[in-house]
Amino acid sequence: MKNVANLEGEVYKTTNRIIQRQRMKDELNILFPEVAKQYETDLDNHIIYTHDEASTPVLKQYCMAVSLYPLLTEGVGNIDGVTPSEPNDLQSFSGQITNLIFLLSSQCKGAVAVGEYFIALNYYVVKEFGDKWYEKLDCEASSPHCLIKRTVRDNILKAFKQFVWGVNQPAGNRSYQSPFTNISYYDHTYFTSLFGEFCYPDGSKPEWIAIDTLQRMFMKWFNQIRLKQVLTFPVETFAMVHNGDDIIDLNYKQLCAEMYAEGHSFFTYISDSADSLASCCRLRNELAENTFSPTSGLTGVMTGSCNVITLNINRIVQDWALTHTLNGTPLIKGKKLIDNPLRVTVIENDLKNYVTRILERVYKYHIAFKTMLYDLEDKGMFAASNGGYIHISKLYSTIGINGLNEAARFLGMKVSNNPEYIEFLQLILGTIKEQNKLHSIHDRKRPFLFNSEVVPAEGLGGKNYKWDKEDGYVVPEDENLYNSYFYNAHDNTSILDKFILHGHQTYQYTDGGSAAHINLEDHLSKEQYLKLIDFAIANGTNYFTFNIPNSKCEDCGKIIKRPIDTCPCCGSHNITQYTRVIGYLRPTKAFGSDRQQEARNRIYSDGKSQV
């Protein structure tokens, strides 16, 4: 929705970028003077891209998954300086957690994940309706003097509404965008691992049956409410643990497939142990420790990214290729290779060394940025740190990846489930993961930890394509932007091949997550989703979601959770399609022109015939 609030956010972008770059160059001149000038050169040459560089003139972390324990003990008063106390009932909790998300989102550029939402919510449900409240869901819980009679269930649903309507409100401090909000569901195995030692401020512990009831209630309710209003947030992640053969908590496996079949949309994260956690739509946190601290409430859910710098792999690979000859003849810039004549996986050390030299500079850029964040934190400038919700030390510095498919196609490879392409993915992803570990600094006071992700690139995918084409590099003629998947979104790659491409062969080389987005033309049956969960376990596909476009009739307001041309209620053709680039649901007409063109070319698979 265009208005003066988001126009205001656009006006100062050029100024913001100038300020941010100068600040970085000043810090690099102090810490790493040998790369201070190179930073701007790398940006101007589109070798790298610093995300949200122009969104704000001040330093902010990128995204965060926070602990809610300080909210339970102190409330948001330790941030806003206004709220007099911690929440004392269900209604005040719902109000304060919404306020918290807005307060935290004002101090970061991206998402805020509240992985403990249902754990915290249960604390106040118990306070209000007593132990074993889940046995009293249909009992009336309102005074005889109340005109509106509400049951325990009604009061919980009211709390859901307050939270969801709240986080979908536009925020003035974010150019009239809603705060990007994430929540998580945990199966019994995950719950036991993450929260087995967790204690509420009053010394009590959360019961699994209570958390299970809240999670199921919310999923069912949220799925139904999206038939009345297309809601973007919260983005949901459904976490389960498997034993190598099957999901251990079979009840949650059934629930997962059931909710997909009923048309709900969420991410699924499966792991062979509860030692990692997908907190945002892309971030995977390998839990170094998972012990409960009664002073901080730490349960292993605190993580995030302080900065994202993305490598343009297509340009990097082409620059590398131009340093070689083919049969004694220099390569010509802008000419695509046929059948991988450079045999890139045979001379892999050469490309690996080339990428590593770039990475060594990028790590210095990241250290400079995070050092400035540490300095601001020491001065008390981050309310999230002051309040104990997240600390800069918990945040990763992220190496983003874009243009992988396009680089492979330049080299003459076919982007599909074939050994040559998979080896190329392993080479690039593996090099970055290896260097991330080698360059991470595990300092107790000021650690510098690195991870990687295949970035969503909602805007960057089109920018990199445009910049590379203008500068004479090879770009695919059947695309208009760079992909964010390990397959081509515009071809008919089978569903199973998509799972395989995002499976163990590649996933073991990523340390920040890369969700497989399976674009389908319609919803599958529960039995088919169960088969795909089994297939994901067998192939090590840890992180996936299913994307079926939604449709809304602009004349009568009817919402259908599949693509349609004609409204079944009023016959209107005035239909708005909603889909996901990566992560969150948006109307296609709100995309940039390049994304709208890509959306028209994207293939949505006939899953019913493939599974």
Residue ranges and their predicted role:
Residues G400-G403, G512, G583, D594:
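Glycine-centered flexibility sites
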Residues S397-F410, G430, R580:
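Contiguous, well-ordered alpha-helical segments that form the cores/surfaces of helical PPI scaffolds
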Residues K2-S393, K414, N418, I422-P568, ...:
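Conserved catalytic cores of very large enzyme subunits
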Residues L411-E420, K589-Q597:
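Glycine-rich phosphate/pyrophosphate-binding loops
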Residues I392-S393, S397-G400, R595-Q596:
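Core of folded catalytic or high-affinity ligand/protein-binding domains
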Residues K561, C569-V611:
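Long, charge-rich boundary regions
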Residues M1-K2, L7, T15, G583, ...:
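Mature N-terminal, pre-catalytic/accessory segment of carbohydrate-active enzymes
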